A protein has these predicted regions:
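Feature marking well-ordered beta-strand scaffolds used for ligand recognition
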Residues: 1-174
Length: 174
């Protein structure tokens, strides 16, 4: 799917996005899509899944990746070096409620442990950490733990993506 409808019903084309995410309610999120400002965009496929409607786009800061759960969006703002938390109960008017700087300030990926409300982040840079953040209260974010693989043997290991599934972390490194 390349063609979308804006709020006025006009068609436009998105040819490039870094990531696409679909939440539990079926909304589509584009991250790093130049045509919608390189932040994140929310699309509603409920009327026509072949031509979803753009209902919101945040076109300020570059958003490399998002993870959504229970009306909360967690965003990896790569160049700002933070993850941000957004209240998206009203998908047409999300509200940024918090952000947190990560250790190596190049926040590439975010993924939530849904049971414990722990957000895992990875900074895509040499020797960086995978960090675990308690986001149960977005107004009081606390770092719980961190992990680095093989740093003593090879300081050039770079964490790329981190995913949480069934009490395990799956991390790609290069």
């Amino acid at each position: 799917v390349f063609d979308f409808l804006n709020a006025d019903g006009d068609s436009f084309r998105v040819t490039n996005a870094h990531t696409l995410y679909v939440d539990e309610k079926g909304f589509i999120y584009l991250s790093g899509a130049r045509e919608v400002g390189a932040g994140f965009a929310i699309l509603d496929p409920s009327i026509d899944p072949w031509q979803p409607q753009l209902i919101f786009n945040q076109n300020g800061d570059y958003m490399h990746e998002v993870h959504v759960w229970e009306d909360v969006l967690y965003g990896a703002e790569l160049f700002n070096g933070v993850f941000s938390i957004w209240d998206i109960k009203d998908r047409k008017a999300p509200k940024r409620i918090a952000d947190q700087r990560t250790a190596f300030t190049f926040t590439h990926s975010v993924w939530l442990d849904r049971k414990q409300k722990i957000l895992y982040t990875a900074d895509e840079t040499n020797g960086a950490l995978v960090e675990a953040w308690d986001v149960s209260d977005p107004y009081f974010i606390r770092k719980k733990d961190q992990f680095r693989v093989g740093f003593g043997a090879d300081p050039y290991h770079i964490p790329h993506n981190v995913f949480h599934h069934q009490d395990h972390l799956y991390i790609s490194w290069y």
